[in-house]
């Protein structure tokens, strides 16, 4: 008798309980969708503002921004960026105003193979690591140093970069530092930043590019500026390459 009296009330509660369960699952599913959407947006944002090279991640910056310091997480001793140890040789390099390069009278005549608009260039036939290019250029002539070109539209680069990339004398001496060159003279507004200490020119792009492995062998751009070219060396200027 009691069961018969309570059964209508139970029947009235069952739909309400089912409705509450449905609402709970709907809310839970909605929250999951919102969370998934937020994570997707975050991943897309990181894809836009970060670039990953191997297991190193670097903030991506537009080319015309001023170079900012970047943190590189340690990987292992063989590839870790440790300017205090591995780049100590860069800290010993002196600018031209403090060095022996511009004190040699014979530097007034270009001893190199090619003469550009203002610079005298020489490219050793062998390839070297970025570090060894500094010494290769110095060993060829007291006039030469690993050079950073001011005019990469010079026909010389059409001739030289046809086959290979070439190291140039642009580098970081340490983290949290500005770019440096031996002659303290460069005027670039666009760079590819990979937060490494070496830079090169490539046949694929007229922009200067940073390279992740500075021990790789490439050609070296040895050069000097502010000289008086002799007629013999002027005749060696390469003709523009078309096509």
UniProtKB/Swiss-Prot annotation:
Major localization listed first in the record, in broad terms: host cell
Matching Gene3D superfamilies: Mannose-Binding Protein A, subunit A
Keyword list, A-Z: Disulfide bond, Host membrane, Membrane, Transmembrane, Transmembrane helix
Sequence ranges assigned to domain C-type lectin in this UniProt record: 116-223
Protein name from the UniProt record: Putative C-type lectin protein A7
SUPFAM superfamilies: C-type lectin-like
Keyword RNA-binding: no
Record keyword Transport present: no
Domain of life: Viruses
Upper lineage: Viruses, Duplodnaviria, Heunggongvirae, Peploviricota, Herviviricetes
One of the record's GO cellular component terms: membrane
Positions of transmembrane segments: 23-43
Subcellular localization, as worded in the UniProt entry: Host membrane
Membrane topology of the entry: Single-pass membrane protein
Disulfide bridge positions per record: 137-222, 198-214
């Amino acid at each position: 008798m009691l069961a018969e009296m309570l059964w209508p009330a139970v029947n009235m509660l069952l739909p309400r309980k089912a409705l509450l369960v449905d609402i709970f699952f709907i809310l839970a599913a909605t929250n999951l969708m919102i969370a998934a959407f937020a994570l997707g947006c975050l991943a897309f944002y990181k894809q836009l503002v970060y670039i990953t090279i191997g297991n190193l991640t670097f903030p991506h910056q537009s080319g015309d921004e001023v170079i900012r310091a970047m943190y590189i997480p340690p990987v292992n001793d063989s590839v870790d960026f440790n300017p205090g140890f591995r780049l100590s040789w860069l800290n010993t390099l002196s600018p031209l105003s403090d060095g022996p390069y511009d004190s040699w009278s014979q530097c007034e005549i270009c001893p190199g193979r090619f003469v550009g608009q203002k610079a005298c260039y020489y490219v050793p036939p062998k390839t070297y690591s970025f570090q060894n290019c500094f010494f290769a250029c110095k060993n060829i002539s007291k006039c030469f140093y690993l050079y950073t070109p001011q005019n990469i539209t010079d026909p010389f680069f059409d001739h030289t970069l046809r086959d290979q990339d070439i190291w140039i004398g642009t580098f970081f001496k340490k983290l949290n530092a500005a770019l440096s060159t031996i002659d303290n003279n460069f005027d670039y507004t666009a760079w590819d930043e990979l937060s490494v200490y070496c830079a090169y020119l490539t046949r694929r792009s007229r922009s200067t590019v940073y390279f992740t492995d500075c021990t790789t062998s490439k050609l070296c751009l040895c050069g000097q500026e502010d000289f008086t070219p002799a007629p013999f060396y002027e005749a060696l200027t390469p003709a523009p390459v078309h096509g």
